[in-house]
């Protein structure tokens, strides 16, 4: 109290944090306290790093021979061509035209990347997929043959490390491709996928309303059946098992994962991923694609725990990007 009447202490008047202010009347400006667990540390190599993003198909083509190319893919002879973005005769955008960039091409460009001062590469998905963007994973254990082989990936990581460059992979774990060994809607893979039989070992990875054609998808894209992250078999395969996808590629040379659509993965899954990643490589980074403010994010009715210290190391920080673009273009 002051002079017999109550005063309040709260956020600074400009609401920009720092030292607070005394309020003698009216409501205190709202404020937020962000806390995290004691001992929470982020990887040293990622702090302050300029991260160079590579879309593998369009970065650099080494000229190395391609092998085991699945059917249905077309290649541009001219590197300067426009991508085939228009719908086909059936009204579908297939994303199956390729320019042939590969892992060996990235390795050959190490001097260029080193000259730029790049300490970390973030690569869009590299696993076998039907599309050129590769966000419709077909096989998590295999590098897409257009990009090279698993051995090529190990060589790239080793060569990059010699130049002081780390590599972060894109982890598309909230959904797979319908054209995958796990779902196998088009029977391009041997064995029995979730779409082929109720007895498939993968059928409980997904959620079917009416089997087999009515299944939960990412944003209703039928090419991207959504994962049931509560399924223990999926968790073992992807995260908790000794040979899990999260662990295997870190052991093979990756320095972290950027998690596609992190909002689609529950907090307990993210905690398991963090534990698995740090077990495989204590200095690995776990980065989330979160479009809003990560410390206030609510998804599917749940306030997310991204920043509490036992899930993500960091996020893509699109709000900062939006603010910078607005400032540079003269918008408020």
Where are these regions (language model features)?
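Active-site-proximal beta-strand/loop segments in catalytic clefts of secreted hydrolases
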Residues: 55-57, 124-126, 171-172, 260-261, ...
């Amino acid at each position: 109290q002051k002079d017999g009447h109550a005063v309040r202490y709260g956020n600074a008047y400009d609401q920009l944090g720092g030292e607070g202010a005394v309020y003698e009347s009216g409501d205190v400006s709202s404020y937020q306290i962000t806390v995290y667990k004691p001992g929470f540390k982020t990887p040293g190599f990622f702090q302050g790093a300029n991260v160079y993003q590579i879309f593998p198909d369009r970065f650099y083509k080494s000229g190395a021979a391609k092998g085991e190319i699945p059917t249905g893919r077309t290649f541009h002879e001219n590197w300067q061509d426009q991508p085939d973005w228009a719908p086909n005769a059936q009204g579908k955008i297939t994303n199956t035209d390729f320019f042939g960039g590969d892992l060996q091409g990235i390795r050959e460009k190490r001097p260029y990347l080193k000259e730029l001062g790049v300490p970390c590469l973030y690569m869009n998905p590299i696993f076998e997929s039907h599309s050129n963007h590769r966000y419709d994973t077909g096989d998590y254990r295999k590098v897409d043959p257009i990009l090279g082989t698993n051995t090529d990936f190990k060589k790239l990581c080793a060569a990059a490390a010699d130049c002081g460059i780390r590599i972060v992979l894109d982890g598309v774990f909230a959904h797979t491709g319908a054209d995958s060994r796990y779902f196998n809607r088009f029977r391009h893979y041997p064995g029995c996928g979730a779409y082929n039989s109720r007895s498939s070992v993968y059928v409980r990875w997904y959620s079917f309303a009416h089997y087999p054609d009515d299944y939960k998808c990412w944003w209703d894209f039928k090419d991207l059946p959504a994962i049931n992250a509560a399924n223990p078999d999926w968790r073992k395969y992807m995260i908790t098992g000794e040979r899990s996808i999260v662990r295997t590629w870190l052991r093979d040379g990756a320095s972290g994962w950027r998690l596609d659509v992190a909002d689609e993965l529950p907090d307990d899954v993210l905690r398991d991923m963090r534990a698995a990643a740090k077990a495989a490589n204590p200095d690995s980074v776990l980065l989330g694609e979160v479009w809003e403010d990560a410390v206030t994010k609510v998804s599917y009715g749940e306030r997310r725990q991204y920043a509490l210290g036992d899930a993500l190391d960091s996020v893509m920080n699109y709000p900062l990007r939006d603010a910078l673009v607005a400032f540079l273009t003269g918008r408020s």
